[in-house]
From Swiss-Prot:
GO CC field: extracellular region
Function as written in the Swiss-Prot or TrEMBL entry: Has antibacterial activity against the Gram-positive bacterium S.aureus, and the Gram-negative bacteria P.aeruginosa and E.coli. Has antifungal activity against C.albicans. No hemolytic activity has been detected.
Name of the protein in question: Hylaseptin-P1
Claim: Secreted is one of the keywords in the record: yes
Organism this protein belongs to: Boana punctata (Polka-dot tree frog)
Compartments where located: Secreted
Keyword vocabulary terms for this entry: Amidation, Amphibian defense peptide, Antibiotic, Antimicrobial, Fungicide, Secreted
Positions carrying Glycine amide: G14
Classification lineage: Eukaryota, Metazoa, Chordata, Craniata, Vertebrata
GO-annotated biological processes: defense response to bacterium; defense response to fungus; killing of cells of another organism
Major location (coarse): secreted
Tissue specificity statement from the Swiss-Prot or TrEMBL entry: Expressed by the skin glands.
Length: 14
């Protein structure tokens, strides 16, 4: 879902 995409991006940015 959209939240999963946000979490994935946040993890990649971290």
């Amino acid at each position: 879902g959209i939240l999963d995409a946000i979490k994935a991006i946040a993890k990649a940015a971290g």
